Amino acid sequence: MARDKIALIGSGQIGGTLAHLVGLKELGDVVMFDIAEGIPQGKALDIAQSSPVDGFDAKFTGANSYEALDGASVCIVTAGVPRKPGMSRDDLLSINLKVMEQVGAGIKKYAPNAFVICITNPLDAMVWALQKACGLPHNKVVGMAGVLDSARFRYFLADEFNVSVEDVTAFVLGGHGDTMVPLVKYSTVAGIPLPDLVKMGWTSQARLDEIVDRTRNGGAEIVNLLKTGSAFYAPATSAIAMAESYLRDKKRVVPVAAYLNGEYGVKDMYVGVPVVIGAKGVERIVEIELAGKDREAFDKSVGAVQGLVEACKKIAPELLGA
């Protein structure tokens, strides 16, 4: 059986980490694409040379032409620029929207049957733009956010309780940013909801609130520590979990930026919600009932995403006709 082809669009820190993980997990052959000549070729060769040591068989190719995407089963998009000091939100949107338009055109032409995972920030707006630009079905285009945000929440909780991360489940909804909504009552340790653990004296509500805040600012914390960029190991690992669920039809229930058309009262927008990912892409959107503060926080998060999408429509009106 022929191996799947995984196209990585953008060969920076996340792209390189993605390529290495695809090899280690033997998910398929890898094409690394970037507009910078030599970078994807060099990284692809470097990772390929690690395969005899780690014992995985996969072909790694670097390319500067979208033709290399031809027939890809999965495309993971990290292309774009990070927000730099002094750069306004609209500056960032303007640059990365152009990138999404180019990438979308490349995917449309060469990989129309792919499952597409967007990682480029601002995530919820970029995945919306990418879907408009490539024209692929909504269930085949998603954004990587919730898996990462939930992983951060799970790690902080496991650290707090001194238990295995495997026994912690966490639930994060909403946009990928400081308005995300970590849902405490749906997060558990070995099936025991966090509010019960507070009653049991494992932690306090105040401490839980601190962990929720730290989760919201998880990305910024790493940016401030690194000073030269943003997180790449955990984001790449999160995207690979999504790709693996698609390629192997695992039907995992994971939070992703998914297209909503009425679910959660949201229309024509990508927002972080739990979904089932299988061989057909997003096979089901899991719609839970939100009330009180959770609903309020979710609506606020959706409002923040809507603001970004409206800004995108003004900057790149051509996307609406795509």
UniProtKB/Swiss-Prot annotation:
Supply one GO BP term: tricarboxylic acid cycle
EC numbers for this chain: 1.1.1.37
Quote the catalytic activity from the record: (S)-malate + NAD(+) = oxaloacetate + NADH + H(+)
Keyword vocabulary terms for this entry: NAD, Oxidoreductase, Tricarboxylic acid cycle
Task: Give the first-level EC class, as a single word.
Answer: oxidoreductase
Q: Which Pfam families match?
A: Ldh_1_C, Ldh_1_N
Can you tell me which residues form the catalytic site?
176
State the similarity comment.
Belongs to the LDH/MDH superfamily. MDH type 3 family.
Q: Which PANTHER family match?
A: L-2-HYDROXYCARBOXYLATE DEHYDROGENASE (NAD(P)(+)) (PTHR43128), L-LACTATE DEHYDROGENASE (PTHR43128:SF16)
- Per its database record, what is this protein's job? Catalyzes the reversible oxidation of malate to oxaloacetate.
The protein's name in its UniProt record: Malate dehydrogenase
Q: Which organism is it from?
A: Rhodopseudomonas palustris (strain BisA53)
Q: What is the lineage of its organism?
A: Bacteria, Pseudomonadati, Pseudomonadota, Alphaproteobacteria, Hyphomicrobiales
